[in-house]
Design a protein with these regions (language model features):
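Catalytic core of non-heme Fe(II) oxygenases with the double-stranded beta-helix
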Residues: 84-99, 103-160
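Short, motif-level signal for alpha-helix interfacial/capping segments enriched in acidic residues
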Residues: 1-7, 114-116
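Non-heme Fe(II)/2-oxoglutarate
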Residues: 3, 9-106
């Protein structure tokens, strides 16, 4: 349980510019390889301009409602689902770890929320240089968001 070990021993709390946490080394090397090998389109090859969202299809949420394939956004991210979990065995283990009582209680204590009736939605995203994300609340049911960055090429940690 790599994530839980990191939550217990490698977590820093920050209050500026808002309360957030930094968890160091929450993934195994195998999981990192699985993420870096995921087949996701590189947005630089799609001739798209970053607009502060991951939608990248020129429309807001209302524009995309009813588009079952997610529009262009779907091509630039990959959700780990029951149907494709065999392609992501290590990320599937991470989902199970996030669903474990020990982990969701630990995270809940950090953020001050009861996560006992929550769901995990894990996606692999190909954010590239120049990407930025507006603060947002995309669905009211969302209790928290977390982002784990994989930096295999020693890019600057000050990019965003």
């Amino acid at each position: 349980m790599e994530l839980f070990k990191s939550l217990e021993t490698k977590t820093k709390n920050f209050n500026d510019p808002f309360q957030h946490f930094e968890i160091n080394k929450p993934l195994t090397e195998e999981t990192i390889k699985e993420i870096s090998n995921a087949e996701i389109a590189d947005p630089r090859n799609e001739n798209l301009k970053y607009d502060g969202t991951r939608a990248l299809d020129g429309g807001d949420g209302a524009f995309r409602s009813g588009i079952k394939d997610g529009g262009k956004a779907k091509k630039l991210r990959c959700y780990v689902t029951k149907e494709n979990s065999n392609q992501f065995p290590n990320l599937t283990k991470l989902i199970e770890e996030l669903r474990s009582e020990k982990v969701y209680k630990k995270i809940g204590s950090l953020i001050g929320k009861n996560l006992s009736n929550s769901y995990v939605r894990l996606e692999v995203i190909c954010d590239r240089e120049g990407f930025w994300l507006k603060p947002h609340c995309d669905i009211k049911e969302k209790l928290m968001s977390s982002i784990i960055f994989i930096n295999l090429h020693n890019e600057s940690k000050n990019l965003g």
